[in-house]
Amino acid sequence: MTDAFCSPLDVRQIEENFAEINPAMTSAEAGVEANRCLYCYDAPCMHACPTHIDVPGFIKKIASGNLHGSARVIFDANPIGATCARVCPVEVLCEGACVEKTLLQKPIEIGRLQRYATDYALGNEKQIFEKGEPNGKSVGIVGSGPAGLSCASYLARLGYDVTIYEKKPLAGGLDTYGMAEYKMPQSVSLAEVERIAQMGVKFLTNTQVGKISESPAEAEASVAEAIANADRDDRVVPVEEIPAVQIVSFDDLMKWHDAVFLAVGLGRTNRLGIPGEDLEGVIDALQFIEKIKTREWKTVPLGKTVAVLGAGNTAIDAVTQAKRLGAERVVMVYRRTEKDASAYDYELELAKKDGVEFIWQAAPIGILEGENGSRLALRCERTDGSLQLFEVPCDMVIKAVGQQKMRAFFERLAGVEIDERGRVVVNASMQTSNPKIFSGGDCANGGAEAVDAAQMGKLAAQGIHENLSGERVRFAGSEAPSIERSERAAHHGAENNA
């Protein structure tokens, strides 16, 4: 798109619009809030957290001024605790289960307290956990999102030589590229990646697992110089300094490593299968969000009127960010009713406060070249039984209708079993139908929260260690997710299960 279809706002205003919606606590605020906690025995909040963080434990350490100890409790159960402090749906997890919510209708602000402690740790040079004594075993991890980072962190603590293969220029997966910037700045995800790298985990970015290959040493050498130069300047490697994408074959991956963990997430955005889907001005929501994450505001494509298709949390991220970039009108179109939307209620309320319009029970049937000054027109049909046809004039259409499962990758390349919904089949230890291959995250659960993926990465690390060493180890919060929790996650991941 040209500059005419980019944000009309000045950079200062955009920066204000994208400031974190939940501000950091001051030390005084954190102290007061921490002292409200009842420090429950067998705390409901701890059970409600998929990674089972010892919530009363870390809050009590905040109250006593031991922030390093508090952060250690958090990262012991969840290696991406700073990310989850920002993006977790705490209203339906830990804070939703808080006893104070029942008593006073005001739960302890667990998410903000967790952020307070983890931000302290990320801003402090003191390492929380160190790499374990080398045990001579090697593990390859495909994907550097929440599940991959979590698994790598625990394996490093156990002394494994861990290499993460990531196809994007930067590590962090969805946390780095797919979270709304006003919820979580990209810098937070990259800081957690850096902490895990300091534990000896190697990150081979711009590296895709495919059919041809080069050795790990050759692959690592191709990015080593750029990373070394960046390290000297104490900065994140700019995208333009990272070499072009290289391909590593899955067969060689299996030869190089004693175990492989697949944490590749989901694939491309689902196709709508309607006329006009490939017109200029039609874009995938994840592409739109990824562009915003660069914070190069004036290069982000934007229409004056934006139509977003879908009603999941990704759709909410798209509509709110389009509005905050300066779109004059943003409309969210969904084929079902508001109560059927998979987005959380508080996410919908945020979009409403931002001035987003909603059209419920309307299915897109085509995208047309626009008339009367509009670049496009979204043609819809009512799904309320009336079959009424209408058009939404717009300059941009954003598709947020879920992502495809990577069936070909798992069936043809990895050769592991998948279920009828395209999810990798795993046991309680995250082991697949191939005993050497483990899997976790969205590719195994169909699409849930970052915190769910972090827990699966933890369970996989335990499973890999037991499989390779015969030793049973349990990290903090190793309980498997409850049936109720899994069902809730499945509902809110429904946009990816279409």
Language model segments and positions:
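Ferredoxin-type iron-sulfur electron-transfer modules and their immediate structural context
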Residues: 1-138, 257, 262-278, 369-373, ...
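Residue-level detector of alpha-helix initiation sites
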Residues: 79, 145-147, 312-314, 444
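A short, basic/flexible loop-to-alpha-helix module at the beginning of a structural domain
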Residues: 120-139, 249, 288-303
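Feature captures the FAD/FMN-dependent oxidoreductase FAD-binding
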Residues: 133, 138-140, 190-274, 366-377, ...
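Phosphate-coordination loops involved in phosphoryl transfer and adenosine-cofactor binding
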Residues: 135-138, 206, 302-306, 361, ...
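N-terminal Rossmann-like FAD-binding beta1-loop-alpha1 element of flavoenzymes
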Residues: 138-163, 315-323
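Rossmann-like dinucleotide-binding cores of NAD(P)H-dependent redox enzymes
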Residues: 164, 168-205, 319-366, 472-488
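FAD-site-proximal beta/loop scaffold in flavoenzymes
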Residues: 278-303, 393-447
